[in-house]
Amino acid sequence: MSDCFYLFEVLDHLTLDRTPGPVPERVGGLVGLKLLHLHLHGLFRSQDLELGRDADTGGQTLYVLELARSLANRAEVAHVEVVTRLIQDRRVSLDYSKPLEPIAPCASIRRFSFGPRRYLRKEQLWPYLDELADQLVRHLRDSDNRPDWIHAHYADAGYVGALVSRRLGIPLAYTGHSLGREKLRRLLAAGGEHEQIEQNYSISRRIDAEELALAHSDLVITSTRQERDEQYARYGCFNPDHAEVVPPGVDSRRFHPQGNSDEFTEVSELLSSFLREPERPPLLAICRADRRKNIPALVEAFGRSAVLRQRHNLVLVLGNREDSRQMDRQQREVFQQIFDLVDRYDLYGSVAYPKHHRLDQVPAIYRWAAAQRGLFINPALTEPFGLTLLEAAASGLPMVATDDGGPREILSRCDNGLVVDVTDRESLQDGLERAGADRDRWRRWSDNGVEAVSRHYSWDAHVCGYLALMQERLKRSSTVTVSSQLLATPLGLSPFGSRLLLLDLDSSLEQPDLKDLQSLRQQLTAPSAQAAQTSFGITTGRPLGVARQRFSELHLPDPQVWITQAGTQIHYGEEEQADRFWQAQISVDWQRESVEQTLSDLGDHIKLQKPEHQGQFKVSYLLEQPGPSVLPLIRQRLRQSGLHARPQLRCHWFLDVLPMRASLSEAIRFLSLRWGLPLEHILVVASQQGDAELVQGLPAAVVTADHDPCLDGCRHQQRVYFANRSRLMGVLEGLQHYRFLNARSRLD
């Protein structure tokens, strides 16, 4: 037996421990938590946030920055790092191209470049998130300061956080901030077409990412009970035992009712060019120019009401804007609707929409509006929480807000205004008219808001509650620690050289041309391949025994690794030594019998394949009739049953249901982590439906000319080569392109 496989025997006798890991080291008698936050979209820096510049730079951006600052000031925290995207774009500040940026003595921003260099809106980031996940795993693997928690914010970060968490065994906390299912529900209720919603928002990918994040989360932090009990409850992978309500807080040093004449003068000058009678009580809205914020409905309600036009001004602080031609389409459409409504109802002199304001002016704007006995208005179609409501309330400004989501809970605690159905134009107009009609009630609401925010929504209370949860949950975290043990185990010998070529037995090696096969055989055994220390592996959906028999007919060199059963089994070399660590990792929450039972009544759509095609971690079906609706149906059924399983379709007819943590892509990353082989030195071949996941991220890939059309969407990936030839000839072309079997490869 070789030294390498003796090592396997030793490792296989190690305990596959899934008990919670050790709590962090103590600093000055207190636990020194190391926290990694993922905030991927928008424009994020340590100061002078460009809030409202676009739909992606809003309340979440401010919350993450303030949370990082506050956590860094706590003795219980050793370090806070916020991971975001590195952007190199002349349209935005050079600040966003700095790889590292300090926030505070114990907090920093770390930026990773993934996808194009230019600034992208969040819906365009999805194809590049696997690249970030691979980079982040590599960074943390090599770091001496691995975090105790990953906290992912929004669906995109949730997706990356889930991948990093399961690969490295780091507990994951997740905050959705807003949820895709709720957004879809609201947009459909407002008359939106599902196809158009999908095109604008990539809503299916977002919901899938949220389900993945929830499936891997040890802690889900929500802002309200309604968000926890109603919005998250619509997700099949949501476990209510993992959810805690920790309402965001308000910085009382910035948001308070005590104003001064200088700041009021500055605000008045900001608005003076718009308003004929600036002394009127304002109806104030502060938000991004986003469809979801529903500002045109507010303008229309104001324009239709003689009472409101006579009594109030309308002040819309919708972020900063420069040249409207540089705005994204959604922003332009929102502003155009506002301009059209102002013109239609002749609201000139009664509506203000300043082009610029500073972030430090926002508290003064609230106080100015309160001094004018105005109202704060939040007409959003959906509002997961509503941090601006707390800012307004802390400043003594009563409000009228949407009855969706967080505002209901905030106003029930604060008793400082009205909630209305903002989808009903008459209801919104009536609420605005009633709220401003009674001066004594306005005064009572103002006092109530200031007192309630101080009592229920202080920033200190938020941070204390947050840290208490982090420390308590860490002690009983159920995150699998197999990966953590592997990274801590000195492996020594590896079964691989410096590169690894993975060929698919079911496609590129299926019925190969004899000349092409001979060429591959010669290249794999050539001195140059030996000098390049190139290893060879086989991937297949078949069981190992069947795959070995088929492979023997090809007369190729023996592979160093077999990845079989659609990525659920890993075996090494001639001894066919199974990797028990991989089996232990993917077995978490896997319920094979429950999968079969859950799908047993779908006989009109699928039927079980023969027993020889089944596996311990794979349930295989044949489709009765291929079609685009089958995979979503299976996915929905599995989620509704609370099963941590993932369906995947290959060649339009073959459906496999695997554990949530298993796939060919994940198996490759497991090998990379276990044996220290860089992903950039692994070459995969793709051609079939279902291979799109395989070519994401850092591994190099060859897509043969006879590929399924679904792979055409991967042409933007930098490390994917689309060959001009089919099958094995296309593989040989790809090997030549990368010079993969040469001593000096393009990948080095």
Region locations from a protein language model:
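Catalytic cores of nucleotide-sugar-dependent glycosyltransferases that transfer UDP/GDP/TDP-activated
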Residues: 1-390, 394-478
